[in-house]
């Protein structure tokens, strides 16, 4: 009877408490500490003995292996990098679609963008001497292109500004709720009628 209880306790402890991996067998309980005779057991026999544990642990996946910090960190880093790269195209698409509020913002932004490479060019002057032809043609076509659409954009935003103005007259729709004065009138009538009905009912 006592041996069965001891065996049940050992089995329960084997399933309940995860032990750190031993050098002989990774991640599973090594019974060589229990008996002196089992110290001579080969790793293959231990694997055969521990196959139920392997099956049980494969059924119940440990949270540390499946929810490790490395995949989450890698996932976050992978998400951050595309977001940063997508912000620039998104700003350009927003600027192209919404000309009205962005046109005043574009004009100051373009000089700022032009000012940002200037310090970079001054600091990178030694590298530009090595490759003077490659960066200059790449930067010059990009700068005239935003400058040329800017004079055209003030011509285009004027029609979209007019659709924005009709949106402002649309808020007169909320004034269509002058029904609010009517509810106070009805409760006043009811308040006057309620005390009379209550008094008659009480009498």
UniProtKB/Swiss-Prot annotation:
Annotated GO MF terms: structural constituent of tooth enamel
Biased composition (Pro residues): 143-180
Signal peptide residues on this chain, from the entry's feature table: 1-16
Sequence ranges of Polar residues compositional bias: 120-130
Cellular component GO terms held in the UniProt record: collagen-containing extracellular matrix; extracellular region
Region entry Disordered, spans: 116-180
InterPro entries according to UniProt: Amelogenin (IPR004116)
Protein origin, superkingdom: Eukaryota
Listed Pfam families: Amelogenin
Entry's family note: Belongs to the amelogenin family.
Listed name of the protein: Amelogenin, Y isoform
Gene name as annotated: AMELY
């Amino acid at each position: 009877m006592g041996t069965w209880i001891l065996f049940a306790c050992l089995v329960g402890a084997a399933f309940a408490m995860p032990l750190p991996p031993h050098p002989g067998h990774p991640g599973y309980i090594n019974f060589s500490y229990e008996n002196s005779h089992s110290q001579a057991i080969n790793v293959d026999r231990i694997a055969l003995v521990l196959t139920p544990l392997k099956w049980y642990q494969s059924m119940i996946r440990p949270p540390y292996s499946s929810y490790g910090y490395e995949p989450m960190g890698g996932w976050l880093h992978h998400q951050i990098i595309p977001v940063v790269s997508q912000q620039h195209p998104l700003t350009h698409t927003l600027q192209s679609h919404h000309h009205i509020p962005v046109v005043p913002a574009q004009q100051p932004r373009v000089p700022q963008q032009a000012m940002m490479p200037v310090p970079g060019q001054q600091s990178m002057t030694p590298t530009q001497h090595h490759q003077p032809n490659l960066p200059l043609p790449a930067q010059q076509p990009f700068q005239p292109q935003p400058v040329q659409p800017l004079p055209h954009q003030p011509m285009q935003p004027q029609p979209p500004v007019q659709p924005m103005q009709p949106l402002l007259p649309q808020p007169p729709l909320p004034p269509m709720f002058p029904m609010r004065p009517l509810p106070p009138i009805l409760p006043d009538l009811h308040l006057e009628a309620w005390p009379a009905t209550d008094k008659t009912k009480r009498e």
